[in-house]
Design a protein with these regions (language model features):
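Alpha-helical scaffold domains
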Residues: 1-140
Length: 140
């Protein structure tokens, strides 16, 4: 896939090794080693220059690489349509499998709709998925 190739081109092996130590729950083979600012820039670029590819990427779950999940979160966070952000967030939450992806995922649009977000947070808090609950607590 084009987006995965873009991430692989940004690989930094020493950074991958560092990241693997921070997130021992993820197999090192699933970590490319892309720095967060580069992933955020790629998310913005994809939404601006290749929006169809970006939206198709959001529909393809699960992802294999840790960075694919982070990029997924960063793309969602850039969306301007509250309903779409909620839709994609709800679809994505069960696939979050580590603290780092969970804690970096913060759609700014949530700040504009606190009451609406709270109703979703209350649902997410009831989840059996560890990182869905962690995410809900972080949103609060």
């Amino acid at each position: 896939m084009f987006i995965t190739e873009r991430l692989l081109a940004l690989a930094d092996i020493p950074y991958r090794d560092f990241t693997a130590k921070l997130i021992p729950t993820i197999d090192k083979k699933r970590i490319i080693g892309v720095r967060t600012p580069a992933m955020r820039s790629l998310a913005k670029e994809l939404l601006k220059q290749q929006p169809k590819e970006a939206m198709t990427f959001l529909e393809k779950l699960p992802h294999y690489y840790y960075e694919e999940n982070n990029l997924h979160a960063f793309i969602i966070a850039q969306l301007k349509d509250f309903e779409k952000v909620i839709q994609y967030t709800t679809q994505f939450l069960p696939y979050i499998d580590n603290w780092a992806t969970c804690d970096t995922f913060a759609p700014k649009i949530f700040l504009k709709y606190p009451d609406e977000v709270l109703s979703y947070v209350l649902k997410w808090l009831k989840s059996n998925e560890t990182y869905t609950v962690r995410y809900a607590i972080g949103v609060l």
